[in-house]
Amino acid sequence: NYGESGIVYPDGRLVQFTRAEADNIAEIGEAGVVMHDGTHVQFDRDMAAHHAGTPPQPMPERVTLDQSYGYSGIIMPDGNNRQFTAAESDNLVLVGPSGAVTADGKNVQFTDDGLPT
């Protein structure tokens, strides 16, 4: 939590401000601090959540799959790779062991080899 006299970090560390540092604080908001000297302190995700009193949300992770079709392309049965464009990759919402769901509403079913039908 960022206060007028110091900081309590999400990991429990405490920092006490000097009188000059405390006097330099103009405004403390949800996302950071504005100082009288014109500098800004931008909170990172964890500090902003800690300052707001809410627990941080877990970061989403892309799942790595042991198959020939993934978020970045396809490995063909003949060993050739087909790299997706950025637009094609961005269109993939979810890739699982049996198929993929695209942002434009298509469902792609995979064969036993993990290739689209």
UniProtKB/Swiss-Prot annotation:
Keywords: Cuticle, Repeat. Sequence repeats lie at residues 1-17, 26-43, 67-84, 93-110. Disulfide bonds: none annotated. One of its GO terms (molecular function) is structural constituent of cuticle. It holds the Pfam family Cuticle_1. Calcified shell. This is Cuticle protein CP1246. It comes from Cancer pagurus (Rock crab).
